[in-house]
């Protein structure tokens, strides 16, 4: 999939689930499931409930996403 096809949104982590999966509430109050991107996993970036994150969504499935950035 091309990089142009992704939708980037911001949200807040509300719950940590098993297997590096998180429940994230978007700024528009929708709640989706997200997993951590591979580079974040490689660099051991920890994500905790309450963190602000940037999420990439595909146009094919808007209820699952990938966490690509954790704001400070």
Swiss-Prot record:
It is found in: Cytoplasm. InterPro entries: NA-bd_OB-fold (IPR012340), RNA-binding_domain_S1_IF1 (IPR006196), S1_domain (IPR003029), TIF_IF1 (IPR004368). Gene3D superfamilies: Nucleic acid-binding proteins. Residues 1-72 form the S1-like domain. Signal peptide: none annotated. GO terms for cellular component: cytosol. Keywords: Cytoplasm, Initiation factor, Protein biosynthesis, RNA-binding, rRNA-binding. Pfam families: eIF-1a. It comes from the Bacteria. One of its GO terms (molecular function) is ribosome binding. SMART domains: S1 (SM00316). Belongs to the IF-1 family. Component of the 30S ribosomal translation pre-initiation complex which assembles on the 30S ribosome in the order IF-2 and IF-3, IF-1 and N-formylmethionyl-tRNA(fMet); mRNA recruitment can occur at any time during PIC assembly. One of the essential components for the initiation of protein synthesis. Stabilizes the binding of IF-2 and IF-3 on the 30S subunit to which N-formylmethionyl-tRNA(fMet) subsequently binds. Helps modulate mRNA selection, yielding the 30S pre-initiation complex (PIC). Upon addition of the 50S ribosomal subunit IF-1, IF-2 and IF-3 are released leaving the mature 70S translation initiation complex. HAMAP family: IF_1 (MF_00075). NCBIfam families: infA (TIGR00008). This is Translation initiation factor IF-1. The gene is infA.
């Amino acid at each position: 999939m091309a990089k142009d096809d992704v939708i980037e949104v911001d949200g807040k982590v509300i719950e940590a689930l098993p297997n590096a999966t998180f429940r994230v509430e978007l700024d528009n109050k929708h709640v989706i499931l997200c997993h951590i991107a591979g580079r974040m996993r490689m660099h051991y970036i920890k994500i905790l409930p309450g963190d602000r994150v940037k999420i990439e969504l595909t146009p094919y499935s808007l209820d699952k996403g990938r966490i690509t950035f954790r704001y400070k």
